[in-house]
Amino acid sequence: MRHGVAWALLVAAALGLGARGVRGAVALADFYPFGAERGDAVTPKQDDGGSGLRPLSVPFPFFGAEHSGLYVNNNGIISFLKEVSQFTPVAFPIAKDRCVVAAFWADVDNRRAGDVYYREATDPAMLRRATEDVRHYFPELLDFNATWVFVATWYRVTFFGGSSSSPVNTFQTVLITDGKLSFTIFNYESIVWTTGTHASSGGNATGLGGIAAQAGFNAGDGQRYFSIPGSRTADMAEVETTTNVGVPGRWAFRIDDAQVRVGGCGHTTSVCLALRPCLNGGKCIDDCVTGNPSYTCSCLSGFTGRRCHLDVNECASQPCQNGGTCTHGINSFRCQCPAGFGGPTCETAQSPCDTKECQHGGQCQVENGSAVCVCQAGYTGAACEMDVDDCSPDPCLNGGSCVDLVGNYTCLCAEPFKGLRCETGDHPVPDACLSAPCHNGGTCVDADQGYVCECPEGFMGLDCRERVPDDCECRNGGRCLGANTTLCQCPLGFFGLLCEFEITAMPCNMNTQCPDGGYCMEHGGSYLCVCHTDHNASHSLPSPCDSDPCFNGGSCDAHDDSYTCECPRGFHGKHCEKARPHLCSSGPCRNGGTCKEAGGEYHCSCPYRFTGRHCEIGKPDSCASGPCHNGGTCFHYIGKYKCDCPPGFSGRHCEIAPSPCFRSPCVNGGTCEDRDTDFFCHCQAGYMGRRCQAEVDCGPPEEVKHATLRFNGTRLGAVALYACDRGYSLSAPSRIRVCQPHGVWSEPPQCLEIDECRSQPCLHGGSCQDRVAGYLCLCSTGYEGAHCELERDECRAHPCRNGGSCRNLPGAYVCRCPAGFVGVHCETEVDACDSSPCQHGGRCESGGGAYLCVCPESFFGYHCETVSDPCFSSPCGGRGYCLASNGSHSCTCKVGYTGEDCAKELFPPTALKMERVEESGVSISWNPPNGPAARQMLDGYAVTYVSSDGSYRRTDFVDRTRSSHQLQALAAGRAYNISVFSVKRNSNNKNDISRPAVLLARTRPRPVEGFEVTNVTASTISVQWALHRIRHATVSGVRVSIRHPEALRDQATDVDRSVDRFTFRALLPGKRYTIQLTTLSGLRGEEHPTESLATAPTHVWTRPLPPANLTAARVTATSAHVVWDAPTPGSLLEAYVINVTTSQSTKSRYVPNGKLASYTVRDLLPGRRYQLSVIAVQSTELGPQHSEPAHLYIITSPRDGADRRWHQGGHHPRVLKNRPPPARLPELRLLNDHSAPETPTQPPRFSELVDGRGRVSARFGGSPSKAATVRSQPTASAQLENMEEAPKRVSLALQLPEHGSKDIGNVPGNCSENPCQNGGTCVPGADAHSCDCGPGFKGRRCELACIKVSRPCTRLFSETKAFPVWEGGVCHHVYKRVYRVHQDICFKESCESTSLKKTPNRKQSKSQTLEKS
């Protein structure tokens, strides 16, 4: 019995408290962190505004679809696909893609108070909290790990219509996802208002009443949704006391799937399964308040209450407008609209004219509540469907026949009668009033030419048939001649369309004479003559020629209303007013003829052999053949002629037609104007076109907004009539437009809306709103109706609660309450236990309008009507779920328990760790559960591994004897959630599992591809690699590392995956480095980053430093001696490469001496420019490594000016040096080329200047077979002229004598013994002498005779460098590049000593000879 009572008490507590089992709210400290200090963005302070579209960094799943953006709306709602600015909430479900998550959808106004914050969050603290919340509220998802959170917070916001001192609410929406599953959490701190004060919401000044806030979420398909209980009712003011997760003010849902899943603790007894308390299709939700089970009913649309037992009164929000009466239905309402309004909520103003159709341009008007058609002239009938017979009675006189027209008639008169009614003729007409032509009481007055009808007030027209419209605009006493037109009959002295112009002088009273005494008629300020029948009609108006406008005897020719003058000879001008100039001034006489004038003519006196009027005929007569056409006159000249063309023609033979206007192309009185090769016609009034051939046509007139249009034509004088639509009136300037002479219509009218509120139709203080063709009365409190003429029904506000019905009384109402409720408004609930509903001795307890039966032992149910089952005593406890079957029970154990009644705890493995990580696999190990008993229960382990994006999931079963496992076939660089469970097999094929031991592991990513070294300098090494778009999809970065052999560790740098190259800088020259690359997957610590296997070590030597301070120490005509800084001690250099480059070729010398600091380049040509490059070579295990070249530019000395000598008698020569500074290039010139020769012819010059050692020091132009002899010692530089044939080769240089009597034979280093052999020239020095050898000899004393022997050899040309590297036929691989082979001729030098041979002495001569060497 104790168990039954305990269970009943729990159920009683659940039913008594419902969703409000625990009072309270979520404190701000328990909200997810928010605010500006957290980096939140804030929505604009705008009524019904929001954040606009906010792109998301990860897609968010919602009802089976992924969304990449969302909107944070100020009105308490997060929406996908589109922004939601609607402020009055709509009951879920909603269609039309309204995908929304609404914590509190209401009319929020953040302009008055509060802020709306929002942000994305991926920081570890937020993700950890979100993960813990989801795992707690959804215990079946213990492997869930949040990767993204979105937080939106409405902080201290008030309602529309409120102020800064109005009540404020604070609530929050949290979105959570791991990329596959998604959840939302609602947090409510303080909810004190529910509704805005807008008319459609209906809230009061405190933010309560009307249509309250909606909470929940909606899929947007009109079917799938969830509404938090109490949505759109007054219960939303206490939503902070409700929950579905055991925390008052907090709701949690999973929202990624096609079906809604509601959160719960999952460890309490289900009240919903036991009682099923929700009615009318409401969904029951178990709350998990520890020790106090309760439930919440989520009602279908149209129902409310704790158990969804109350039908929502949709009329409470007063949806019917304009005085409509609301009738309540189930989840619906219907509005009965008053007269003049329609639509679902009586929102549309209606008029009797909406269904009335008037024909033939008739206008509908409302008169006394009915629609009446006001017809256009000529039509009648209820719908203007009948044409008025204007010929009844017959208005035509004197036997004329009447033809009926629309709104008019015309008379076909018999001879000799005419006039509008055939009233004019040759015979006296009887009294025209005898036929009583005037209608509607009009008085007929007989006139000379007929009759005139004087119409009574309200009528007009020729016969008083037409009713005067209310808006007749005729001025100065004018009468309107037709309805809906502005045609005025003006009184005497006025004219114009509206009789607006006064005639100051009557034209017919100013002695105006009409031809043959015709009758004068005033017309528009002018006059017209009505001629007698037998008078010529052309005299009805004066002729333009009547004033004799042509002078000097010119004749006038009239053309309609214009004229032209034909002038006599000698005059011209429009009126023949101008005299022509002297006839002879134009020189008409040809061929030297003399012109004489007489009597207005001229005469030509022709010279000999010419005749003719203009002396144009000669012999022979060229005009005899008649070459001039079109009447041209031929003038004869000697052997030729010229045509004098008549007016209008031109050309050599007058063959060119006249000007365009010559043929008078303009018709209908148009005036022609010549325009180059074309003409232009100035047309008379009423005509248009290129030749004035068409009458003026204005085309159809344009439409005017809010007006209908009628027009009688498009020609000159045609009239267009505009009639404003119902609800609009004419403003300016006129309703009539006239087709004007220049082919356009006159200014159009305007139709402006009529203010129907001007008459103040609303009664009892109601305010009037103007509408098109109508008005709307907004009634004051207590009145209603179209004009606020009715007193309001107090029951319309639905004051009765809990389903009570209202009865209206004069100035009051009374509520009839349903069973269970009493009070003035049925607000008090009666004791539900009065009916004794409990069976089998159950005790009834009431509360909150409901009751609960506390059942005795062995009975349960809502009324204790059901016999107890085996699960009543909860044999499975809180460790499993009990299932009854055939009087027995079975337990389905929860995670961590096993055994028959789930009484044994199943322990998980411990010390789960990672042993090895590879690209496609992971090795893990663990320890079995502690204790022999715990191990005895085990049947094995379940190893589950799931990829972080959920795309891969697998579970392996591992035998109990093993404590490690290899996870295979994994993707490279991918993160996996690994869970290991202890497993106990059951006989019912359902295994019990322990809580998991979890581990997050990531496989190694793939290494880079295509790694290579792209460039090496003395201080940098550049490398590049490639990442494949698919194979390296999980790679987030690349780590490049380098190590010097003497360094203790690598120097590593991480670069982004988008980078594919890197340069190591600040390296030491000539050193060996080791380079390796690895890829990285996952950068942050929480992502468990891994690194790929490194690439194979790549050894790279940096280049050695190039030679420093390269300079030219000495430059001669054929050699250059260069020096540079010696290598530092310990240098690994093994050789140098010297490149000699001209503009045509490059030669290289390989010098295998790494300690070299100078080098002499020989075999150069005098006066040439060279580029010298020196490259240092270092030997490595990878082959020779070369430095960058050091460059030097030189110009060799010319022959003359390098070394100058003069040989005199027995004295030894003294060499004068002309050596330039080492840093400058030599600039050698011909010594004696400064003065011009004495004779005009330049004498031949020598071709070479040879020094004492037989070396060419300068080359010049000249004859190669000539020589110059210098006869005496020059006082200045010798001028080498007077070239002679030389009998033999002489190798001498210019020599100068020694000065003084000093004995130079004993000077050290002198040349007194002439030690040089083979013609070598001795050069004395300070301490020693040197020999300057001739061609073909070498050695210190020129003792070696050398010859060069050619032989074929192979030269290698670099594909990347332009210069081959070779020395004496031996190729040196200076660059580690690809070479191509080229066959060439090389020279090998062979030398032989001549010391045993006697060298002939040189013969001294008093004269010195210079010869080509």
Swiss-Prot record:
**GO terms for cellular component:** extracellular matrix; extracellular region
Named from the GO MF annotations, one term is: Notch binding
Q: Which Gene3D superfamilies match?
A: Immunoglobulins, Laminin
Limits of the EGF-like domain: 268-309, 311-347, 349-385, 387-423, 429-465, 468-500, 541-577, 580-616, 619-655, 657-693, 753-789, 791-827, 829-865, 867-903, 1307-1343
Q: What is its main location?
A: secreted
Q: Which InterPro entries match?
A: EGF-like_Ca-bd_dom, EGF-like_CS, EGF-like_dom, EGF-type_Asp/Asn_hydroxyl_site, EGF_Ca-bd_CS, FN3_dom, FN3_sf, Ig-like_fold
Q: Where is the NIDO domain?
A: 103-258
The biological processes this protein is annotated with in GO are: cell-matrix adhesion
Annotated Basic residues bias: 1207-1217
Print the keywords alphabetically: Calcium, Disulfide bond, EGF-like domain, Extracellular matrix, Glycoprotein, Phosphoprotein, Repeat, Secreted, Signal, Sushi
Pfam families in the record: EGF, fn3, hEGF, NIDO
Keyword Glycoprotein part of the UniProt annotation: yes
In what residue span(s) does the Sushi domain sit?
696-753
Disulfide bridge positions per record: C272-C284, C278-C297, C299-C308, C315-C326, C320-C335, C337-C346, C353-C364, C358-C373, C375-C384, C391-C402, C396-C411, C413-C422, C433-C444, C438-C453, C455-C464, C472-C480, C474-C488, C490-C499, C545-C556, C550-C565, C567-C576, C584-C595, C589-C604, C606-C615, C623-C634, C628-C643, C645-C654, C661-C672, C666-C681, C683-C692, C698-C739, C724-C751, C757-C768, C762-C777, C779-C788, C795-C806, C800-C815, C817-C826, C833-C844, C838-C853, C855-C864, C871-C882, C876-C891, C893-C902, C1311-C1322, C1316-C1331, C1333-C1342
Instruction: Tell me the leader sequence span.
Output: 1-24
Give me the ranges of the annotated region Disordered.
Answer: 1206-1226, 1394-1413
The protein's location, in the record's own words, is:
Secreted, Extracellular space, Extracellular matrix
Domain Follistatin-like per the UniProt entry, residue ranges: 352-374, 507-530
Fibronectin type-III domain residues: 908-1006, 1007-1105, 1106-1200
| Residues glycosylated per entry | N145, N204, N292, N368, N408, N484, N536, N712, N886, N977, N1015, N1109, N1139, N1310
Post-translation changes: Phosphorylated on serine and threonine residues. N-glycosylated.
Q: What is this protein called?
A: Sushi, nidogen and EGF-like domain-containing protein 1
Q: Which organism is it from?
A: Homo sapiens (Human)
